[in-house]
């Protein structure tokens, strides 16, 4: 639910020009101090960028496969450093993250056994 609200809010911020935002703020008699959601939005964008960077670093080892993802993740393809890589984003709580870690470990063990 929070993710949906943030997505909708980010779309509105992107679509709405800065001038329109000022008019809305003036019309509602709001000041920057009274609109902390703008600061939160910037912090969320920074956190998402950081998460994506760590995801790219993690998936350099699984460049052409999403098998390491497990069922608790969404897999998508992207380009980084001239290579197509797979990105996986965890969807779930601590339990699913533990399962993801175990699945990833098993997958790496299998690939090591197949290599030897």
From Swiss-Prot:
Residues 18-53 form a propeptide. It is found in: Secreted. Residues 1-17 form the signal peptide. Expressed by the venom gland. The keyword Secreted applies. GO terms for cellular component: extracellular region. Residues 24-46 are annotated as: Disordered. Keywords: Disulfide bond, Ion channel impairing toxin, Knottin, Secreted, Signal, Toxin. Its main location: secreted. Disulfide bonds join 55-69, 62-75, 66-112, 68-88. GO terms for molecular function: ion channel regulator activity; toxin activity. It comes from the Eukaryota. Belongs to the neurotoxin 03 (Tx2) family. 02 subfamily. HNTX-XV sub-subfamily. The presence of a 'disulfide through disulfide knot' structurally defines this protein as a knottin. Probable ion channel inhibitor. This is U30-theraphotoxin-Cg1a. It comes from Chilobrachys guangxiensis (Chinese earth tiger tarantula).
């Amino acid at each position: 639910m929070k993710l949906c609200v943030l997505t909708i809010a980010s779309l509105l911020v992107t679509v709405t020009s800065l001038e329109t935002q000022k008019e809305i703020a003036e019309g509602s008699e709001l000041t920057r101090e009274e609109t902390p959601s703008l600061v939160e939005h910037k912090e969320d964008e920074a956190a998402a960028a950081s998460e994506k960077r760590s995801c790219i670093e993690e998936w350099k080892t699984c460049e052409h496969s999403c098998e390491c993802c497990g069922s608790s993740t969404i897999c998508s393809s992207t380009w980084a450093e001239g290579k197509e890589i797979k990105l996986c984003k965890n969807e779930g709580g601590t339990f699913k993250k533990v399962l993801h870690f175990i699945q990833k470990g098993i997958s790496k063990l299998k690939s090591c056994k197949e290599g030897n």
